[in-house]
Amino acid sequence: MVPTEKLAQITERFEYIEARMAAGAAGEDIAALGREYAELKPVVAEIAAYSRARADLAEAEAMLDDPEMRALAEEEIPALKARIPEMEQALRLALLPKDAADARPAMIEIRPGTGGEEAALFAGDLLRMYQRYAEAQGWRFQIVSESLTELGGIKEVIAHVSGSGVFAKLKYESGVHRVQRVPVTESGGRIHTSAATVAVLPEAEAVDIDIPASDIRIDTMRASGAGGQHVNTTDSAVRITHIPTGLVVTSSEKSQHRNRDIAMQVLRARLYDLERQRADAERSAARKGQVGSGDRSERIRTYNFPQGRMTDHRINLTLYKLDQVMQGDLDEVIAALAADDQARLLAEVEG
């Protein structure tokens, strides 16, 4: 049973915000009110539906004492009793604490791991998988920095993804992705195992993370292209070191000004991610290492090409539709990961 007092408080808060926004909310932060309104609206809709169902059940049970209405009540009561637990579960999920970063755009960083050139080629496959997934979601996908190998693989790529609910879905992709297949570079037909690392960070604005100029060191260096050749003769590449944490971010596009912007954007995202991880650890050590924790060293998924199989090791989910997955069909696996995350959070909240 969900405490009715808590439901009443949420509804009252929603009605207050609605009234303040309708009145113009002079002197208040309209944007903050708008965000809270948008967050509470679906919760209040669940509360209203749940309250109506309970009222309908109480009314039907009262009708049992009326001989003329008894037959109708006996017909309605089983259906109402069956619906209420489902609605209560939906309401409990709606009441779960929200990740403040879920609505934010995201930065995706992909780097090859073990496996040499094959790992770099697989990193490129992952990039295209996310591009197709973003397109299917109606998101904007922009590559902000990319370094390629001579065979067209990826040494490193950073992309910016914006749209509705980007980080809420992509956050489950952080970790080590392993591939098992016969590489194009393999003449003997042997299956190799390679890996690539994906990091998904919520975008951070300057107002979220204050980086004093005294905390960073900016170095310029000569940019290199595929195979290590110099792509120009100017020192356009930028390396920014965050002195307090030791974080280092490098960008080597052709424009030094753009490289500074990219490096600062990535640095803000990484520092914001560190703050989030620290806060999560303080809130609950029990959630460390679970789905969505963002542990970059965790092997999360295996893509087995000979068997056409994708396995997500965090929830023991295996799908035999690898071709569709690599074409960006990630809905099923992401939905399963989100459901598992909700179940764990619900268990934690309810003890």
Swiss-Prot record:
Provide the Gene Ontology terms for cellular component: cytoplasm
Gene3D superfamilies reported for this sequence: 3.30.160.20, 3.30.70.1660, 6.10.140.1950
Q: Entry's InterPro entries?
A: PCRF (IPR005139), Pep_chain_release_fac_I (IPR000352), Pep_chain_release_fac_I_sf (IPR045853), Prokaryotic/Mito_RF (IPR050057), RF-1 (IPR004373)
Q: What is its main location?
A: cytoplasm
Cytoplasm in keyword set: yes
Post-translational modification (record): Methylated by PrmC. Methylation increases the termination efficiency of RF1.
S-S pairs: none
UniProt KW Membrane keyword? no
Residue positions of the PTM N5-methylglutamine? Answer: Q229
Q: Which GO terms describe its molecular function?
A: translation release factor activity, codon specific
Q: Name one Pfam family in it.
A: RF-1
Listed A to Z, the keywords are: Cytoplasm, Methylation, Protein biosynthesis
Question: Where can this protein be found?
Answer: Cytoplasm
- What's the stated role of this polypeptide? Peptide chain release factor 1 directs the termination of translation in response to the peptide chain termination codons UAG and UAA.
NCBIfam families reported in the protein's UniProt record: prfA, PRK00591.1
Q: Of which family is this protein a member?
A: Belongs to the prokaryotic/mitochondrial release factor family.
Q: What is this protein called?
A: Peptide chain release factor 1
**Organism this protein belongs to:** Dinoroseobacter shibae (strain DSM 16493 / NCIMB 14021 / DFL 12)
The organism that produces this protein has a lineage beginning with:
Bacteria, Pseudomonadati, Pseudomonadota, Alphaproteobacteria, Rhodobacterales
